[in-house]
């Protein structure tokens, strides 16, 4: 019984990896059908549906992986790092680095791969980015409590500016067919961003 569950889990992971790889390839710029995915995995469409009730559930699983990966690591950054600008820099670098290592998933993060899918998938991605923006805002607010001085501009505006930078870099990555890496020249860009905060 345990072996059967392990095989099923491995097949599920294989299907999700194939979907992520297809999103990374030229197929990712078009709608991915279950027929194409099944052919890529080397199984029938019926076999896909034994592991996932729908393509939406496959995307749900990939979004869950994105959410878990980012939120877990952001929480570790917040736990381990206390200096405001280092926290912000590490969170942005985390998002950009994750996207760079997972180009197919970046198409999901930007919503590009979800254009032809159910609206609730895009809603999940929107909620993820809203949570990240909220965490950035909280880091900025804690700076005022910790150091006794705030920023010249409202924390909400600053948090949205930082997140907009990330989203812009992810969009550029997709638009360039993954030529322009999101972390490219980050060490030069970060001081410019940090200067805007003061």
Swiss-Prot record:
Keywords: Cell cycle, Cell division, Coiled coil, Cytoplasm, DNA-binding. It is found in: Cytoplasm, Nucleoid. Residues 113-144 form a coiled coil. Residues 33-52 bind DNA. One of its GO terms (cellular component) is cytoplasm. GO terms for molecular function: DNA-binding transcription factor activity; transcription cis-regulatory region binding. Residues 9-70 form the HTH tetR-type domain. Its main location: cytoplasm. SUPFAM superfamilies: Homeodomain-like, Tetracyclin repressor-like, C-terminal domain. It holds the Pfam family TetR_N. It comes from the Bacteria. One of its GO terms (biological process) is cell division. InterPro entries: DNA-bd_HTH_TetR-type_CS (IPR023772), Homeodomain-like_sf (IPR009057), HTH-type_TetR-like_transc_reg (IPR050109), HTH_TetR (IPR001647), NO_SlmA (IPR023769), SlmA-like_C (IPR054580), Tet_transcr_reg_TetR-rel_C_sf (IPR036271). Required for nucleoid occlusion (NO) phenomenon, which prevents Z-ring formation and cell division over the nucleoid. Acts as a DNA-associated cell division inhibitor that binds simultaneously chromosomal DNA and FtsZ, and disrupts the assembly of FtsZ polymers. SlmA-DNA-binding sequences (SBS) are dispersed on non-Ter regions of the chromosome, preventing FtsZ polymerization at these regions. Belongs to the nucleoid occlusion factor SlmA family. Homodimer. Interacts with FtsZ. This is Nucleoid occlusion factor SlmA.
């Amino acid at each position: 019984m345990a072996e059967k569950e392990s095989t099923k889990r491995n097949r599920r992971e294989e299907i999700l990896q194939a979907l992520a790889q297809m999103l990374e390839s030229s197929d990712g710029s078009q709608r991915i059908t279950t027929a194409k995915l099944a052919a890529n995995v080397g199984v029938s469409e019926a076999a896909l549906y034994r592991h996932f009730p729908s393509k939406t559930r496959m995307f749900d699983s990939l979004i869950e992986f994105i959410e878990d990966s980012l939120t877990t690591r952001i929480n570790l950054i917040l736990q381990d790092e206390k200096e405001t600008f280092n926290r912000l820099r590490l969170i942005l670098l985390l998002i950009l680095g994750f996207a760079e290592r997972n180009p197919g998933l970046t198409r999901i993060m930007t919503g590009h791969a979800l254009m032809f899918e159910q609206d609730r998938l895009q809603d999940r991605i929107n909620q993820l980015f809203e949570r990240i923006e909220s965490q950035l805002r909280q880091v900025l607010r804690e700076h005022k409590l910790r150091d006794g001085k705030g920023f010249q501009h409202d924390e909400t505006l600053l948090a949205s500016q930082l997140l907009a930078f990330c989203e812009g870099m992810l969009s550029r990555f997709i638009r360039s067919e993954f030529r322009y890496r999101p972390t490219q020249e980050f060490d030069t860009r970060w001081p410019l961003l940090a200067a805007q905060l003061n």
